[in-house]
Amino acid sequence: MTAQIANGGYKIKPHIIYDKNINFENAQQKIAKQFINDSLLDNATTTDNYLVEREYQLYERLYKNSQNINFVKDAMFGSTNEQYGTSYKSRYENLKYQFAGKTGTSQVRRITEADRKLNLKQSQIKYENRDHALYIAFAPYKDPRYSISVLIEHGGSGSKAAAPLASKLIKKIIDRHDLREQTIKNNLTLA
């Protein structure tokens, strides 16, 4: 769903990407056969990077009014990049890594009146009774390529546990993408 928000509200048709750096050819073939025509696999080599061909079609918009999806995107941006946003501490000032996200916290059990009076912090509660921490995001904000969802069981709040982890993952993913692009560019200029 996060990817659908990032792309402006269009339904997404999943596809499989092969990467020559993955050494699990048999697993790839087995998984791929569930999704694509076997004849495409017969013509593919495991050492090449390629995108499995699929039929391009007009994707259906999820929302009739594009202002609605823009409102959600702006709210996710504010949640991460504005001073009082719930995941503000996890943001990057560098525009290259700027992302939009939303925190979430899920109760594991009912909180009793007696529990409320104790006013316990998550760290003071038995592990199995602590809240689950959630965070969804897409990045980079201006030109989204990635969406991420982080769930940490019994992690406490989304802003303290899940958002910082998502932030680190987003930075690593973008850096890896840039490194891959640079490697491809260098290989082409040497050839």
PLM feature spans:
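Hydrophobic/aromatic hotspots within intrinsically disordered, low-complexity regions
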Residues: 35, 40-41
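Active-site beta-strand/loop architecture of penicillin-binding DD-peptidases
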Residues: 2-26, 41, 50-58, 67-180
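A structural-propensity feature for long, helix-poor, extended segments
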Residues: 30-34, 57
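Short, highly charged C-terminal tails/helix-capping segments
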Residues: 181-191
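Alpha-helix boundary/capping detector
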Residues: 27-31, 174, 191
